[in-house]
Regions:
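Secondary-structure end/capping motifs
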Residues: 212-294
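Short amphipathic alpha-helical segments at helix boundaries and their inter-helical linkers
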Residues: 59-63, 162-163, 260-273, 306-314
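Short, glycine-/small- and polar/acidic-enriched structural segments
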Residues: 2-143, 148-151, 158, 167, ...
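Pocket-lining segment of extracytoplasmic ligand-binding domains
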Residues: 68, 104, 155-247
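Soluble non-cytosolic domains of exported or imported proteins
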Residues: 17, 45-49, 123, 127-128, ...
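Short linear loop/turn motifs
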Residues: 40, 47-48, 255-261, 294-305
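Conserved C-terminal helix/tail region of periplasmic/extracytoplasmic solute-binding proteins
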Residues: 284-335
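Solvent-exposed, polar/charged alpha-helical surfaces in well-ordered, non-transmembrane soluble domains
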Residues: 21, 29-30, 49, 53, ...
Length: 335
């Protein structure tokens, strides 16, 4: 038998969020090994901003991040998005892993977004939490100036709510699930709602992507297999999460995993281009960013399209991508 080549070493950055868990699952279940990779996960970062800073500093080869990559590209980082860790290739809106939580005496009413007016709301600037909150305000007919936004890292949001430093927060899981268990009288004002399209990409710097196509395909096959395992085994997946996300308790992980598996889809379709375009459009309209970039220059779908063709079984439990949004290599998105 031919000797197996030494596995290819990879360092991948993740954020302490339940929707990132395909990475540790692929490590623990041996999927990376199966495809010839030796993957080290760089510590869970608080947000994608921190993960991208680590990528820029050369601490990692690739990261999983979303909205913060928009700001990074506009500041001159040449990033390429080549897969989705969370989002949806079959429909436009997907934000099931996000929620807005209010404190019990805040005067904010469950289901009534207009009651946010005049309140202090915690979010993490430049992340999907921020984009989601902006989307909620827009849905309520409010503007960002109708509330006081407080820039807060996710690990500190529940403390801020308990101490009444803020009236509410918008965040990704597990933070909202923890609030509902640990903050007396906490109110889930809204969860998800298809208010925005989730942005969660596998990202690396362009020179690295140009040199490592075969490695990227191996990586995407391994995490796609981890995704499918997670969709089929949410309870076991939640248990793995407790070993990787600091302070994550099993009951919280299991609840969060039920939301997470609703949008675990590594595939790329025209919807994912639109999601990135729409996020920029919203952020620019509301003055968060000054300029925008062409999404076609920063999404490279050929690697995941190759994996979809070679390993169709890894996606067989997902809804098929509608023909009108299915793409081929060389696809150009036009808004």
């Amino acid at each position: 038998m031919a000797q197996a080549k030494d596995p290819i070493k990879l360092k991948v950055g993740m954020v302490a969020a339940v929707d990132m868990l395909a990475l540790p699952i692929a490590v623990e279940r041996g999927f990376f090994e199966k495809y010839g990779l030796d993957v080290t996960i760089a510590r869970p970062y608080a947000t994608g901003v921190d993960a991208l800073n680590a990528l820029q500093a050369g601490e990692t080869d690739m990261v999983q991040a979303g909205v913060p990559a928009i700001g990074a590209i506009l500041r001159g980082m040449d990033l390429v998005f080549f897969g989705n860790f969370s989002g949806n290739a079959t429909k436009l809106g997907s934000d099931a892993t996000l929620a807005l939580i209010a404190g019990k005496d805040s005067g904010i009413v469950k289901g009534d977004l207009k009651s946010l007016k005049g309140k202090k709301v915690a979010t993490s600037f430049g992340t999907i939490n921020h984009l989601y909150l902006l989307g909620l305000l827009e849905k309520a007919g409010l503007t960002p100036s109708d509330v006081t936004l407080v820039n807060t890292p996710p690990p500190e949001m529940n403390v801020a709510l308990l101490a009444k430093g803020v009236d509410a927060f918008a965040c990704w899981d597990p933070v909202p699930v923890i609030a509902m268990k640990d903050v007396p009288g906490a109110i889930e004002v809204i969860r998800g709602g298809d208010v925005i399209s989730y942005l969660g990409f596998n990202i690396a710097l362009r020179p690295w992507v140009e040199k490592n196509g075969a490695t990227i395909e191996k990586f995407l096959a391994a995490v796609s297999e981890a995704d499918q395992w997670m969709r089929k085994n949410p309870k076991q997946a939640a248990a793995i999460g407790t070993r990787w996300i600091p302070g994550l308790k099993l009951d919280v992980a299991e609840t969060a995993m039920q939301y997470n598996i609703q949008q675990v889809d590594r595939r790329i379709s025209a919807h994912n281009y639109r999601a990135l375009w729409k996020a920029q459009d919203t952020l620019q309209r509301l003055g968060v960013i000054k300029s925008v970039f062409d999404v076609n220059k920063h999404i490279e779908p050929k690697f995941i399209l190759g994996v979809m063709k070679t390993y169709p079984d890894l996606f067989s439990d997902l809804q098929p991508i509608p023909a009108d949004v299915a793409i081929e290599p060389g696809f150009v998105f036009k808004p």
